[in-house]
Amino acid sequence: MIDVDALSKKYPAIKQMQAYEPIFWKNLNYKKEAELPVGVEHIFDAEARFQRFAPYFEVAFPETLPTHGILESPLLKMDKMKAVLNAEAQNQVKGDLYLKADNYLPISGSIKSRGGIYEVLKFAEKVAMKHGEIVYGDNYAKLNEPRFKDLFGQYGIVVGSTGNLGLSIGIVACKLGFRTSVHMSSDAAQWKKDMLREKGVNVVEYNDNFTHAITEARKSAEADPMAYFIDDEGSYDLFLGYSVAAVRLQAQLKAQNIKVDAEHPLFVYLPAGVGGSPSGVAFGLKKIIGENVHPIFAEPTHIPSVSLGMMTGLNDQISVYDAGIDGVTKADGLAVGRPSRIAGKMMDTLLYGIQTFDDQKMMKNVAELHDSENVDVEPSAASGFTILDDVQAQLEQDYPMENASHIVWATGGSMVPKNDMDQYVAEGHQVK
């Protein structure tokens, strides 16, 4: 049992967390030296694998033709949204504000297209090579042929998800021919479950939280010798799939003449649930773009799992439920009570800090983004905007802000059905 009273004496911010007050946790280990189990070479290995699969995506998912089979999203300037936010803020955003629009990523419309799809590709390549069906120099478009569907159909892919990870893995694994099961927690949006079933995925629903769903998913995979389990709580393949985003972002920064140096720092605001995708992206940013990019996570006040884990140093050994925090949030993609086994360890020296936020403010930002920039995102994807005001006060103590650039990472949204999106916007309009 975890002695929460003793912990909260040592870390007084836990009391604020228990009262659902927004907090900023500053990482005192930021920028210290650390030995990490993966490095820049692993990022480029993952990028090369995405390149090998590009011809497959062009034939299997024609929506990727405009980007030649590469799954990437635009970097959009947010001048109107910045003006809206600054009109309400106590702490003005100085410099330029951008949206990394992973809500527009092809195939599954979320950041999970990066890590989730990558791990499926890596497994598919391994299986095809094991059976002598492909070599590295082949044109991978042939993986769309019926004989590969028959081969992959002998294998299962299993994952536990609150929604977007299941969507990305389910769509691609099923298309390749794998028997695919997605175990979903009670937080998962109905439309995500419906879409997966339409694609032929076996959706297993639980009237319980993510930790329960992923535990059951793991058990079911262990019981099937031909099943491969994708572990959102501890997979380095997922992590590295996300990290490739940094290679692509670096090129976008150059194309848009966005300077990144000591006088022009770059701040990147990433929503965190289990912490895998923002950690993978943050790792990539620090390894590829370097010391003048500063990642910051955003978490709901009702489920601050990564901040609780990192603040106490307990990481995945503590869940928000241990601290009596209810874990209820409208940000379904962030509804994970226990952080990933690798997020806290990998982020120990690479993450500037974490800001928690109020759900109502997030819903307001969903509506403001819709109204000002005509960009639709699901609630959790707006949370980078939600934390801007609070975080600026912290950043100004450490960095020159006049010429800074800020990137809010929009983690999902383009697949949201219109009725659901209209409801999110209407709810946001109600918030004063």
Curated annotation (Swiss-Prot):
One Pfam family matching this protein: PALP
EC annotation from Swiss-Prot or TrEMBL: 4.3.1.18
InterPro entries in alphabetical order: D_Ser_am_lyase (IPR011780), Ser/Thr_Dehydratase (IPR050147), Ser/Thr_deHydtase_PyrdxlP-BS (IPR000634), TrpB-like_PALP (IPR001926), TrpB-like_PALP_sf (IPR036052)
Enzyme class: lyase
N6-(pyridoxal phosphate)lysine modifications at: K112
Catalytic activity: D-serine = pyruvate + NH4(+)
One Gene Ontology molecular-function label: pyridoxal phosphate binding
Keywords assigned by UniProt, alphabetized: Lyase, Pyridoxal phosphate
Lineage: Bacteria, Bacillati, Bacillota, Bacilli, Lactobacillales
Family membership: Belongs to the serine/threonine dehydratase family. DsdA subfamily.
The species this protein was found in: Pediococcus pentosaceus (strain ATCC 25745 / CCUG 21536 / LMG 10740 / 183-1w)
Protein name as annotated: Probable D-serine dehydratase
SUPFAM superfamilies, per database record: Tryptophan synthase beta subunit-like PLP-dependent enzymes (SSF53686)
Example GO BP: isoleucine biosynthetic process
Cofactor: pyridoxal 5'-phosphate
